[in-house]
Amino acid sequence: MLELPIISITIFLPLISVLYILLFISQSKKPDKQIHTMYVAVLSSVLTFISTIYILIEFDSSNPTYQFVERYSWLDKIGLEFHVGIDGISIFFVSLTSFLTLICIIGSLFTVKKYIKEYLVCFLLMESFCIGAFTSINLLVFYLFFEVILVPMYIIIGVWGGENRIYAAVKFFLYTFFGSVFFLLSIIYIYSKIHSFDLSNIGEFTNNFPLHVQQILWWAIFIAFAIKIPMIPFHTWLPDAHVQAPTSGSVILAGILLKLGGYGFLRVLLPLLPNASQEFAIYVIWLSVIAIIYASLVALAQKDMKKMIAYSSITHMGYVTIGIFSFTDSGVSGALFQMLSHGIISSCLFLIVGTLYERLHTKEIAKYGGVASKMPVLATFFMIAMLGSVGLPGTSGFIGEFLSLLGIYKVNVIATFLAALGIILGAIYMLKLYKEVMLGEITNKEIINFRDLYIYEIISIAPLILLIIYFGLMPSSILNVFHLSVENLLVKFF
């Protein structure tokens, strides 16, 4: 294997591009500097995506430990190191981040009308910070990346969002920042006792903390990740953020940022505090079941397409948390698969809604109807994405939900049957959405002038559609990669 600092390259390439844009292109007096910025952003995202493909190709799925490990001293006095690596749990999140960022940047070139340079800079920053969070093996560095992601997303919602964008951006920031404060206090306490931030081994020490200490730390860390995922009752920021965010912002929010919550449970909470995790697991499971049913019922009542998809995200992430806290191989594997699948499906749905919004400038369901007669390609894409969201066998959405339910069935049969109701409710509201938007007669005269997808829209949506089908038909291509890492986590701590 070629010895390259490939993870550092993947993390810092977008940051270097941002510096180049700000220091050189911004100061240039040439009239084409906006086009120059676009070229740099696209090139950066392409190269970052290529580097993640290289990691995927070279990754050894038979090795459950961290690979491509890099360790550089940063602040010796407190043991702070830039310590990064990739295992089966993190590898697909890194790939998903670079893939969705590339799609968003390409799409933004045609849809963003103001401050395009700043917009692209925010997306490159988010790409760098997300990859940093998914690859960090140092707890404090993970926290720093986890926290700083707030800034570019806050700006994206607040500057390029809808009419109530400031309210949504502030609500998003305050919710997430509130949870992060408790997370930071927990990190400080842990370091004061064991003088280490190394995620690869500090669980061996924190596991020996008195149970009451573990319980307090558990709730403090749990809240931070429960807000991010989000779980009820910490969910109210998400619908507002999705409705007000621009299309690409919703793609990154649903496709990547929500996954940081589930990833945090697996990477931080469970390994650091396994005893407390087992004690409180039943509460998380029932909270997840409530979230699945509640969010599904609320989604049924929505009149805004993006808000309906936002509540469906809460439902889907509920399956993630019941899978994780089942502490079973099938449950945790299902949770990981569900996170990857949801990242693809929800991104696809938000892009589809974005194409409709670009034409009619409204997300209100009642304003549509009969769109399929004018946009058959979009209607086909929408159908596949909708069926994936419902969890139809043959799509990626089925595998994650099935494995998560299989995992929880081994723990609590009643919770399994109640959680399965979410699948039925999901089918009802998603089929209702498709029927009201795509089928029937055209009632809005503006729809008569609709033209089908442009090339750049097909380029953005088609790869996601192919992945929904491919992962649904070939789930082993994903499951085999993270199986040993999941098994290693469960055997080591549970």
UniProtKB/Swiss-Prot annotation:
NDH-1 shuttles electrons from NADH, via FMN and iron-sulfur (Fe-S) centers, to quinones in the respiratory chain. Couples the redox reaction to proton translocation (for every two electrons transferred, four hydrogen ions are translocated across the cytoplasmic membrane), and thus conserves the redox energy in a proton gradient. This is NADH-quinone oxidoreductase subunit M. The gene is nuoM. GO terms for cellular component: plasma membrane. The chain crosses the membrane at residues 5-25, 37-57, 89-109, 115-135, 139-159, 172-192, 216-236, 251-271, 280-300, 308-328, 334-354, 375-395, 411-431, 458-478. GO terms for biological process: ATP synthesis coupled electron transport; electron transport coupled proton transport. It catalyses: a quinone + NADH + 5 H(+)(in) = a quinol + NAD(+) + 4 H(+)(out). It is a multi-pass membrane protein.
